[in-house]
A protein has these predicted regions:
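A conserved beta-strand element that flanks and buttresses the S-adenosyl-L-methionine
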Residues: 125
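Short catalytic micro-motifs in class I SAM-dependent methyltransferases
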Residues: 128-132
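Conserved helix-to-beta-strand junction in the class I
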Residues: 147-148
Length: 210
């Protein structure tokens, strides 16, 4: 069951009068900074993309489409699915990137991923969206990814990990919770970035389906 409070808070970012300009400006800043955003300590995506040359991707919680379009424009991906629950965010994405190279899907990942037909190794991405979902929903998403992902697919997550922690829309799970759920995947957990709230947790990991 989608977290309604989290969704409403998320959607507020995209319905304000200046939302389009804010998002467009943020995209330009990422681009002008030579895409260093993808190599921050808590974001494993840059490393994963450098080490695994794939051509297909599923961006979960794609927002206004910066990463999805980056994959096509900068990494020459052939097909990118961008799953986003906010229709307002998708509308902004289509205005920023009118070429329609990304396949946008308006809906919840736990419902939409199972509809995808993937035949080649795929790059799955999340950026701090699973942390806002309940364990049951995340389990559903992960098990569906496991079911449809071809061998050698990659899961790159800028998500917190560490001792269990649940507070309102902020959820953290330990490494074994992730690796037990995706038993056939090989995990690498990043510990360069340490959270301060709550303390003692880290953020970012990669998994490869074997």
């Amino acid at each position: 069951m989608p977290n309604v409070e989290s969704l409403n808070q998320h959607n507020k970012n995209y319905i304000s009068d200046d939302a389009f300009e804010k998002e467009k400006r943020a995209h330009l800043e990422h681009n002008s900074d030579n895409f260093k955003f993808l190599y921050q300590e808590d974001i494993p995506h840059g490393d994963a993309l450098d080490n695994h040359k794939l051509s297909y991707a599923v961006d979960i919680g794609s927002g206004t489409g910066w990463f999805a379009n980056y994959l096509i424009e900068q990494r020459s991906y052939k097909k990118v699915y961008a799953i986003e629950p906010s229709s307002s965010a998708i509308e902004i994405a289509k205005k920023i990137y009118p070429d329609n190279k990304v396949k946008y899907i308006n809906g919840f990942a736990e419902e939409e991923i199972s509809k995808l037909k993937l035949s080649k190794p795929t790059f799955f991405s999340t950026m701090c969206c699973l942390a806002h979902l309940e364990d049951e929903d995340v389990l559903g998403i992960l098990k569906t990814i496991d079911k449809i992902a071809p061998v050698d697919s990659v899961l790159a997550c800028s998500e917190p990990w560490g001792d269990f922690y649940h507070r309102e829309c902020w959820n953290i799970r330990p490494p074994e919770w992730w690796s037990d759920t995706l038993a056939d995947w090989e995990f690498e957990f990043y510990n360069d970035y340490t959270l301060t709230d709550p303390p003692g947790r880290s953020k970012g990991f990669i998994a490869i389906k074997r």
